[in-house]
Amino acid sequence: MDRRNDYGYRVPLFQGPLPPPGSLGLPFPPDIQTETTEEDSVLLMHTLLAATKDSLAMDPPVVNRPKKSKTKKAPIKTITKAAPAAPPVPAANEIATNKPKITWQALNLPVITQISQALPTTEVTNTQASSVTAQPKKANKMKRVTAKAAQGSQSPTGHEGGTIQLKSPLQVLKLPVISQNIHAPIANESASSQALITSIKPKKASKAKKAANKAIASATEVSLAATATHTATTQGQITNETASIHTTAASIRTKKASKARKTIAKVINTDTEHIEALNVTDAATRQIEASVVAIRPKKSKGKKAASRGPNSVSEISEAPLATQIVTNQALAATLRVKRGSRARKAATKARATESQTPNADQGAQAKIASAQTNVSALETQVAAAVQALADDYLAQLSLEPTTRTRGKRNRKSKHLNGDERSGSNYRRIPWGRRPAPPRDVAILQERANKLVKYLLVKDQTKIPIKRSDMLRDVIQEYDEYFPEIIERASYTLEKMFRVNLKEIDKQSSLYILISTQESSAGILGTTKDTPKLGLLMVILSVIFMNGNKASEAVIWEVLRKLGLRPGVRHSLFGEVRKLITDEFVKQKYLEYKRVPNSRPPEYEFFWGLRSYHETSKMKVLKFACRVQKKDPKDWAVQYREAVEMEVQAAAVAVAEAEARAEARAQMGIGEEAVAGPWNWDDMDIDCLTREELGDDAQAWSRFSFEIEARAQENADASTNVNFSRGASTRAGFSDGASISFNGAPSSSGGFSGGPGITFGVAPSTSASFSNTASISFGGTLSTSSSFSSAASISFGCAHSTSTSFSSEASISFGGMPCTSASFSGGVSSSFSGPLSTSATFSGGASSGFGGTLSTTAGFSGVLSTSTSFGSAPTTSTVFSSALSTSTGFGGILSTSVCFGGSPSSSGSFGGTLSTSICFGGSPCTSTGFGGTLSTSVSFGGSSSTSANFGGTLSTSICFDGSPSTGAGFGGALNTSASFGSVLNTSTGFGGAMSTSADFGGTLSTSVCFGGSPGTSVSFGSALNTNAGYGGAVSTNTDFGGTLSTSVCFGGSPSTSAGFGGALNTNASFGCAVSTSASFSGAVSTSACFSGAPITNPGFGGAFSTSAGFGGALSTAADFGGTPSNSIGFGAAPSTSVSFGGAHGTSLCFGGAPSTSLCFGSASNTNLCFGGPPSTSACFSGATSPSFCDGPSTSTGFSFGNGLSTNAGFGGGLNTSAGFGGGLGTSAGFSGGLSTSSGFDGGLGTSAGFGGGPGTSTGFGGGLGTSAGFSGGLGTSAGFGGGLVTSDGFGGGLGTNASFGSTLGTSAGFSGGLSTSDGFGSRPNASFDRGLSTIIGFGSGSNTSTGFTGEPSTSTGFSSGPSSIVGFSGGPSTGVGFCSGPSTSGFSGGPSTGAGFGGGPNTGAGFGGGPSTSAGFGSGAASLGACGFSYG
């Protein structure tokens, strides 16, 4: 029979009106205590009885009638029939008041035992039979009879009950012994019939009396309590009117004793009838009349007639809750009769007739009238006495509590509110109910703490914890506050132990603990459980992939493939069958069910409730996909189901979180829930069952508690952490310090000695980090923040008023309007803030990286006055802002440079006099990369006036701009050059006389890159005559040919250059004397970018000697080659630099003495960005760089490398800094005496000094995805401009890095809409302008490139909306000056992409290998495959 209530049993639905509050055990309000009135009791009884009326008639017991037997032993059997329910009756006190009372003295009874018992949940109809045996000749036979009677009449349960015995002599009736059982008063329980046994004394009366007493004592009936109402009633209170059951046993004495042994004394229990009584007196009447006539026969063998009676005395009929119980008691008379079969048959027939109808047949009764007449007076007196005693005792029981006794096997605990509990289920007893204890938060928290320890102990076995166990073992009388106690415990578990309490079965109230730290498989458990949970994941995946169920045969087929077989013990899993069918089932990981109607029985496995909470179908699907090396979408049905479950689970999680937060707020649950000491000594293991403990005697040794208890609140040097979502006034962490994680306004916060750290997007007033220092992450309105003694740092604040970093220094990352920021002693730095009023970088200086409106010194600010990277007299620079005045990368006089900004005045990269350069800006005036006089250059801008890359007089050059006037890359006289435009007049890259050059045009006449007589050059076009790149005598150059003789980029004597060829002799980019250069060739000798004496650079070659980008003395540079010596970007003595090479010596960007720089190599000496004496720098090498003025020792950028020493970003005395190295020692971002700091070591994803609403920027090395210095609206930027995605100085495995752009998604030193570029070694880098996607000087396997010897996707000096262009040595997918297999570009391998076309080119490759498509034409022309390939 299905029977579950809140604790595992079902309650029938109520048919009547709802009961009053509190009558069904529902919690009272804490400040209200109610009492149940008489009307409430009547109403409740009516409701319960009406609800269970039908259920009473459902399970009639089976009537077993004995067959006639000729044996000497005849059993005494009972026939029990359930009585239907009756209408309600008035309350107990009315019954007791209206009934005439009989005093104990008037009754004068000898002994009357009254037993009051209550049992939970179910009502039992206990049919008891008392056998009165006449005295036999042998006394030992009597013991056997009474023992059997006791066995048949025992109660089915062994729970305790309160017993009150009232004794009084029954002198008036003068009865020998009367045993009366008065059962527990229950509001809707019927009166129990009393067993009345009369023994007529035979010969040995004393023994017969003892036997009868034993039989009576063993025939005790237990009635079950039904509900928990507050009204006290007694046995005599009757909710349903029942008819009295008259059972008479007539014995006829006969002289024939031979057949007396076959006499059968049958006890017949008939159905009760309902009699509606209008008054309380009739409603309380319960009479049991019994008459026993014992006629002694002459022979003693009749004693065997009752020997088998006790075996079937008691039949138990269970009825649901709130049913009427009528216990019929049988009177067994053992008769000694003489022989005479007629008398026996008459008596049997009379009894059978009487059991069928309440009105017995008069004819049958007449035959035994003489026997009834003899006992009629006795029956009347006994009935009156019993009723009087019940009525009198009724009032007493309503005032007296029950006593508690302890049973050995099953213990029952009774609570203050009248609850009586046994096992895992209990119910409330209305007459014993008391009001719930008052709500005391301290006591509730104490119970919650105990519950936490209780749950942690119980969860060790992973068997779900029952709510009833928690109520019984921990919460006890505070069960009214169970929701609040368990919520407090759940909060403590989350905050202290990082586990969540989940109710997996609301019907059975089962709870589990789930850790917030998942394993890779998604299933959670300790280390010792890992093998089992791995096996569980296999089983779950099989079930899920087979339609959410799997037969046992399928499971074993899979397990056999893993070497697991039933019956074979495994070293890790033990008995596998027991593990998957018993342990996992108990832990609710699996369900193991029999297939319906299967013959022989078959079983199936399903997911258990715990599995749905500890993992998900998506995780299991991915697990299966990893095993089979497939994509989850290959299983469309399972994938769709997993996605739906994920969405549903997410919605449920959000709803539960909101509901829990609201509930906790209403209950006032907060940080106090985790306060207070924790003592595990008061926790025993009695709460564990034998099943959970197992056979281990030392149970505690099986449990390991990994507890991360937090420091106590309000202790010395305590921490104050605020995780609230509401407004927070102040939060302190560690000695007054505070840390605040909130999305609402935060006034103040401190971290470590008054400092504070604030994480949030709402207005943040003040935050301090480390001794009144502060750091603010993402606050919308950040007023003030300090970092390291009045210093502050602000990340992404919209409105940042003042920030300081390191002694009133400040740094602002992406704040829109930044009023003042100081970085290192009054200095300030603003990274891409649109409105930056004043920013200083290193001692009063101001620097803005990407700010739109920067008053003083802005790297990409609109109005930037001056910025110096160590050069002597420079005016201003702006990296990708609108208005820029001047900038100098070590040049003597440089006016302005604009990396993608609209109006740019002048810029000099180490040249003497340079006017302006614009990388992608519209109007660009002049720029000089180390040349003497340079007017303007525009990389992709509309109008460009002049540009000089180291040449003496350069007029203009336009990379993809429509009108291009002239450009000189170090040559004396340059007129014009167009990279990809339709009409190109003349271009001189430093040559004296240069007529024309067309990069991709159909007809190209002449081009001279600085060479004196330069006739023509064609980059991939059909007709190509000559090209001189600034050399006096330039013979020939071929971009993509196998053998290239000479090319001069501005140098006087230039011998040969091969862009992608195997052997190169010489190339000069504006240098006076240039020996050789190889752009990805194997062996290159020298290259000079407008520097005076330069030996050799190799852009991707294996061996390179020297390169000078405008520097006076430059020794060697290698962009991707293994050994490189020196490079100087405008500096006087520059020794060596290597972009990805193994050994690099020196690099100087405008500084005086520079020793070495290595971008990604193992060993490198020095890098100087404008500082006078700079020792070493390495961008992922073992040593370190220095970016500073003054005596900066060393710096290590170590992007992905192990050991970086130090770095200094600023003047003064900087000691060291490590930016992302594995073992980076220190970093100092300021002047004065700053010692060390480390920014993003090891595996940093992104960090930087980047711009506006930038997503990720920084100097991040290792496995950093993006790094940079800039960006206005870029997601991540280097030193760059507007909409830069990701760029910077990233080495190692960085994705992209660059120095700025205007609207580029990622850019190097350029503007436009470039995607990714920069100076980084390994993946990508770029140096360029316009609307190119990916370009740069990078080495390694680039997706967007530079001068590399490894596969690169795209780079180059291209203009217009070209996709991918670059100088790459390896396989390039885009277009560029590279060798090796490239899909499009200037490479030696296969090239498939587009070239330098002015129109919509399909693809072109200036490579030495096979080129699938070339389009160096204007318009929509596509020349098809290019023939300049050798691979």
UniProtKB/Swiss-Prot annotation:
UniProt-listed InterPro entries: MAGE (IPR037445), MAGE_WH1 (IPR041898), MAGE_WH2 (IPR041899), MHD_dom (IPR002190)
GO CC annotation terms, alphabetical: nucleus; plasma membrane
Region (Disordered): 1-24, 341-365, 401-433, 1342-1365
Sequence repeat extents: 751-760, 769-778, 779-786, 787-796, 805-814, 823-833, 841-850, 859-870, 879-890, 901-910, 911-920, 921-930, 931-940, 941-950, 951-960, 961-970, 971-980, 981-990, 991-1000, 1001-1010, 1011-1020, 1021-1030, 1031-1040, 1041-1050, 1051-1060, 1061-1070, 1071-1080, 1081-1090, 1091-1100, 1101-1110, 1111-1120, 1121-1130, 1131-1140, 1141-1150, 1151-1160, 1161-1170, 1171-1180, 1181-1190, 1191-1200, 1201-1210, 1211-1220, 1221-1230, 1231-1240, 1241-1250, 1251-1260, 1261-1270, 1271-1280, 1281-1290, 1291-1300, 1301-1310, 1311-1320, 1321-1330, 1331-1340, 1341-1350, 1351-1360, 1361-1370, 1371-1380, 1381-1390, 1391-1400, 1401-1410, 1411-1420, 1421-1430
Biased composition (Basic residues): 405-415
Keywords: Cell adhesion, Repeat
PROSITE patterns registered for this protein in UniProt: MAGE (PS50838)
Coiled coil: none
Keyword Transferase: no
Quaternary structure annotation from Swiss-Prot or TrEMBL: Directly binds bystin, and indirectly tastin.
Purpose: Could be involved with bystin and tastin in a cell adhesion molecule complex that mediates an initial attachment of the blastocyst to uterine epithelial cells at the time of the embryo implantation. Directly responsible for homophilic cell adhesion.
Protein name: Trophinin
Organism: Homo sapiens (Human)
GN (gene name): TRO
